[in-house]
Swiss-Prot record:
Name of the protein this chain belongs to: Interferon-induced GTP-binding protein Mx
Organism: Siniperca chuatsi (Mandarin fish)
Keyword GTP-binding on entry: yes
One BP annotation, GO: receptor internalization
Region listing for G2 motif, in residue ranges: 65-67
Annotated Dynamin-type G domain residues: 30-303
Higher taxonomy: Eukaryota, Metazoa, Chordata, Craniata, Vertebrata
Length: 626
């Protein structure tokens, strides 16, 4: 750390403290924080590297020794200041007086969280260490990757560990510190493979080579090439360190002495002295690089972090608003609370049916559905008219033969006209009723959605509202169906104002004349249609004009009238009756407790949201003050 200039050194601790403070608040539950995660295969020397950086002994041995994610917060103190330590997990927090107790305390924490034995846990243990001999740095140590389950471990222990590691290194905010022994083929290490899968360009991966003293003779050049980034390229490059081996631990070689031996090893090594001279070797150089990388990473991440906190705050407030504050304890206040709830719901129901904005904030739109349904009804009438026109041309002669009485040729048979019109009108009745039922179902669905939104967390209120909505839907649908069927009975009377009918007939004649002119050009030398070869073709032509003209009037009438009936009963009347019936619910004061009984988990959800809001607001305050 001595190579850092004073100005930069003053920025280091505040940056790291900021993220540590956010993590201690629990903000990591809500969004990803900048971090360095240490990963490696079992026996890669990962624990030894962390020991060398922190100056304290950590759990080590064969098998899985890191069984929970360990947040290692190192704080560099001034020379002469005392060492201190603190361990925190779940609801437990304990100061550590002696550095020699750290390993024991971590094992106790792991047993508490992952069970005694060899299981693992996703829960974080936080270890804070302050000492003049440590860098300003925070790392997250993750369990070593196990290839084969040992006695007492679940068969899928390897998959469990990989899933845990994946949750950390997948985040773009995480730098992966991959620990690899020098005496293995780097390309085959699972830790590096995992890092490459989530970070194929090596943008946020840093390689650490360990155990350089165990390299096979003749392979030293390969190690140098790896550190020089010539084998598997990583943007952040590689470092190489030599930590205490088991022999040195047995001989009680101190960490300070181990670092001195490490420096001598690299400085004097035939092949590795170049790495030492280039600043790629030793634990102190690694500490310096990691601190610089973390601070740079934090500074780079801060703008996005601020945005994420604002987004989460907005989202959390919106969710809390949906859950509300919960019912008050005082009976009189409870009644007021219920009245407000029910009134807001019924007002929103009326607003929904009139196209106004809802107070609950939901974006429910009944009129987009109505436009679609009524548009389809209009399209059905148009298609029916086209089919009717074609049918007229085919069957009008047959009807004339069947229904013509004593009239001389050239006289229009009104009975023929009436029979054909009635037959066509009848075919529209059931499609109109189906349209009513489709709209009724859609309106009920929207009102139920509104009830669930308005009475979130109050299942009994939702149940009562749904029952009322269903009963009203059945009643209004029945009334509307009766009105529709009456409308179709009236349509069988075959009536229109003279002026309206004359206008429609005139328009139709003009259209027919234009079509006839076109047809004459095309069929000048051809045989004319059967209609024009008939002696009474003028009569039949006239009858067709009347039929088409009248159907146009009737269909226009139905295109408006059917939607009006449906809209009036299923929207306006339904909303008004729902308002009246929900107001009646308020008269039953004895059921107050029943109506305001909350979901069993609603209180815990509200508390969780309030807790999230609190920590996010604190997090924002930290960022503002930074």
């Amino acid at each position: 750390m001595n190579t850092l200039n004073q100005q930069y050194e003053e920025k280091v601790r505040p940056c790291i403290d900021l993220i540590d403070s956010l993590r201690s608040l629990g903000v990591e539950k809500d969004l990803a924080l900048p971090a360095i995660a240490v990963i490696g295969d079992q026996s890669s020397g990962k624990s030894s590297v962390l020991e060398a950086l922190s100056g304290v002994a950590l759990p080590r041995g064969s098998g899985i020794v890191t069984r929970c994610p360990l947040e290692l917060k190192m704080k560099r103190k001034k020379e002469g200041e005392e060492w201190y330590g603190k361990i925190s997990y779940q609801n437990h927090e304990e100061e550590i007086e002696d550095p020699a107790d750290v390993e024991k305390k971590i094992r106790e924490a792991q047993d508490e969280m992952a069970g005694v034995g060899v299981g693992i846990s996703d829960d974080l243990i936080s270890l804070e260490i302050g000492s003049p001999g440590v860098p300003d740095l925070t790392l997250i140590d993750l369990p070593g990757i196990a290839r084969v389950a040992v006695k007492g471990q679940p068969e899928n222990i390897g998959d469990q560990i990989k899933r845990l590691i994946q949750t950390f290194i997948t985040k773009q905010e995480t730098i992966s510190l991959v620990v690899v022994p020098c005496n293995v083929d780097i390309a085959t290490t699972e830790a590096l493979n995992m890092a490459q899968r989530v970070d194929p360009d090596g943008e946020r991966t840093l390689g650490i080579l360990t155990k350089p003293d165990l390299v096979d003779k003749g392979t030293e050049d390969t190690v140098v090439e790896i550190v020089h980034n010539e084998v598997i390229h990583l943007k952040k490059g590689y470092m190489i360190v030599k930590c205490r081996g088991q022999k040195e631990i047995t001989e009680r070689v101190s960490l300070t002495e181990a670092i001195e031996r490490e420096t001598a090893f690299f400085r004097e090594h035939v092949y590795f002295h170049t790495l030492y001279n280039e600043g790629h070797a030793t634990v102190p150089k690694l500490a310096e690089k990691l601190t610089l990388e973390l601070v740079h990473h934090i500074e780079k991440s801060l703008p996005r972090l601020e945005e994420q906190i604002e987004e989460k705050l907005t989202q959390t407030r919106a969710e809390l608003e949906r859950y509300g504050n919960g019912p008050p304890s005082d009976a009189a206040e409870k009644l007021i609370f219920l009245i407000d709830k029910v009134t807001a719901f019924t007002q929103d129901a009326i607003s929904l049916t009139t196209g106004e904005e809802l107070k609950c904030g939901d974006r429910l739109n009944v009129f987009s559905m109505l436009r679609r349904e009524f548009g389809q009804w209009n399209a059905h009438l148009s298609r029916s008219g086209e089919i009717f026109n074609k049918k007229i041309e085919k069957e009008v002669e047959e009807y004339e033969e069947r229904y013509r009485g004593r009239e001389l040729p050239g006289f229009i048979n009104y009975k023929t006209f009436e029979v054909m019109v009635k037959e066509q009108i009848k075919q529209l009745e059931e499609p109109a009723v189906k349209r009513l039922k489709d709209v009724g179902d859609a309106v009920r669905k929207l009102l139920v959605q509104l009830a669930q939104s308005s009475f979130t967390g109050f299942p009994n209120l939702v149940k009562i509202a749904k029952a009322r909505i269903e009963a009203i839907k059945q009643e209004k649908e029945s009334t509307a169906e009766s009105t529709l069927r009456t409308q179709f009975k009236m349509e069988l009377l075959v009536y229109s104002q003279d002026r309206t009918y004359s206008s429609s007939l005139s328009d139709r004649k003009t259209e027919e004349d234009e079509e006839e002119d076109k047809r004459k050009v095309k069929t000048f030398h051809k045989e004319r249609s059967i209609l024009y070869r008939m002696d009474n073709h003028a009569t039949l032509q006239e009858l067709m004009l009347h039929l088409k003209s009248y159907y146009k009037i009737a269909s226009q009438r139905l295109a408006d009238q059917i939607p009006l009936v449906i809209r009036y009963q299923m929207l306006q009347e339904s909303a008004s009756q729902l308002h009246r019936e929900m107001m009646q619910v308020l008269q039953d004061k004895e059921n107050l407790e029943f109506l305001l009984k909350e979901d069993s988990d609603i209180g815990s959800k509200r508390a969780a949201l309030q807790s999230r809001l609190k920590r996010l607001m604190k997090a924002r305050a930290y960022l503002v003050e930074f």
